[in-house]
Amino acid sequence: MNFSSIFSQLKDPHRLIFICAALLCLTPFMSSPMALVLGFTLASLGWVPKDWNIAALTKKLLSYSIIGLGFGINLTAAIEASSHNLGLIIGSIIFTLILGFIVTRALKFDPITGHLIASGTAICGGSAIAAVAPAVNAKADQTATALACVFVLNSVALFLFPALGHLLNMSQYDFGVWSAIAIHDTSSVVGAASAYGDEALKTATTIKLARALWIIPIALVSALIFGGDKRKLNLPYFIGFYCLAIAIAHWLPQFQPLYNTLFMVSKHTLVLCLFLIGAGITVQKMRASGPKPLLLGVILWMAIGVTSLAYILYFQ
C-alpha cells in the first residue's frame, strides 16, 4: 500500500475515528471493558472499516500478546498453580461437556451446535470452537452460532467477574483461578484478570492456557463421536510459544528489564484485542443466534461459574 492510498483512506472520518480509537486502547487511560464497549459502539454505528479483516487481525494480535505475557510469568509459580489446580481443570471440563450433552438433549437443540457451545465453555471459547468444528464436520452456520453465543457471554463476563470478585473480597490468586475456569475466551480471561490485578492476571493466564491444552484430546474424542476428520484439527500454536517464553525468562534472568517491558506492552495490546473483538460484535449478530443457543450457553456458564466458585472458596 503506497502513501497516497493511506492518506486517501484517512480522509474517511469514520475510518479515522476507528484508527484513533484503536490507538487510544494502547494508552493507560483505556481499560479492557471500556475498550470492548468502544469497539461494540463503533460496530453498531457502522464505523468499522469493511475492507479490513478484523477477525484475522484480532487472532494474530491476541496470539502475540499472550506470548508476550509469558515473559512475565514465573516458571515455578506457573507449575505450582497448574498442578495444584489440575483436578479442578479436568473436573470442570468433564462436568461442562456432560452437562452440555444433557441440556442440549433436554432443549431438543442441534447436537453439533450444542457440542460446540459446550466445548467453548469447557475449554477456551472461540479457540476451542474453531478447533472442534472441523473435527465434527460442523457447518458454517453452526460454528457461527456457537461463536456468537460465546462472544456475547464473554462480553458480559468482562464486566461481571471483576465486580463479583471485589464484592466477594476474593484474593488475587483465587480470582485468577476462578476467571480462568469460568470465563470462555482467553482474551476475556486476561481482560477481566488484568482489571483485578497483575497477580490475578499471571495466575489466570497460566491456568487458562493449561486448560487450553485440553483442546487436543477433546477435538480427537469429538471426531470419534461425531465421525469427523481428525486430520482437520485446528490447534492454537501460541500455547507452545507461551510456554517457551516462560522458559526463556526462567533460564535467562539477566534480561529481566526486557521481559518486564514485553509484559507491559502485551497488557496494552490485549486491551486493543478486546476493542477489535467488540468491533466484530453487532446487534444483528447477537439477535441471529436466537434463544436456544444462548439459553444453553447461559446454563452451562452459570453452572461452571457457581460450582467452580464454591470449590475455590470452600474446598481449595
From Swiss-Prot:
Signal peptide: none annotated. The keyword Cytoplasm does not apply. Belongs to the UPF0324 family. InterPro entries: UPF0324_pro (IPR018383). It holds the Pfam family Cons_hypoth698. Disulfide bonds: none annotated. GO terms for cellular component: plasma membrane. This is UPF0324 membrane protein SO_4708. The keyword Transmembrane applies. The chain crosses the membrane at residues 61-80, 85-107, 114-136, 146-168, 175-197, 207-226, 233-252, 262-281, 293-315. It comes from the Bacteria. Keywords: Cell membrane, Membrane, Transmembrane, Transmembrane helix. It is found in: Cell membrane. It is a multi-pass membrane protein.
